[in-house]
């Protein structure tokens, strides 16, 4: 990623499993273009740690997670979870962070901490003139 855009992002991930130098990041691996599953490591995809050796994750969230891990001097492990299990995975300590296109709602902020937004989207409805 272009560091010009990410240089002012504060990376604060407390209580990561720094003892082994690994940043464990959860995502759905099913929400393209942010994250998806593929069968090869093409185009910079990374193995999905909890899916055996045959599946890989890729997408914007993977690229950003790779950047964060590299910035912290850590290796990256990506874990695939169902959407409803992502926050629980962080709370239980199974993973250190979530990178999954998750909006910071007040309800979620009661359960986990959020960084600054790294992507903003304006959704619209398109209709015939």
List the predicted regions and their residue ranges.
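Ligand-binding "clamshell"
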Residues: 94, 106-121
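Arginine residue identity/basic-tract feature
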Residues: 66, 108, 128-129
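Hydrophobic/proline-rich hinge and linker segments of small-molecule sensing/allosteric domains
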Residues: 24-32, 114-129
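Extracytoplasmic small-molecule ligand-binding "clamshell" domains
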Residues: 1-102
């Amino acid at each position: 990623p272009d560091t010009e855009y990410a240089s002012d992002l504060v990376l604060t991930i407390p209580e990561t499993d720094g003892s082994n130098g690994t940043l464990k990041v959860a995502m759905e691996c099913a929400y393209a273009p942010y994250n998806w599953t593929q069968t090869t490591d093409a185009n910079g995809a990374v193995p999905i740690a909890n899916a055996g050796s045959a599946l890989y994750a890729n997408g914007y969230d993977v690229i950003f997670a790779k950047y964060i891990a590299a910035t912290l001097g850590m290796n990256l492990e990506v874990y695939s979870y169902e959407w409803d299990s992502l926050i629980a995975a962080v709370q239980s300590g199974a993973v250190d962070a979530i990178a999954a296109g998750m909006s910071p709602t007040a309800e979620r902020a009661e359960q986990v901490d959020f960084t600054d937004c790294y992507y903003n989207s304006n959704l619209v409805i398109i209709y015939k003139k």
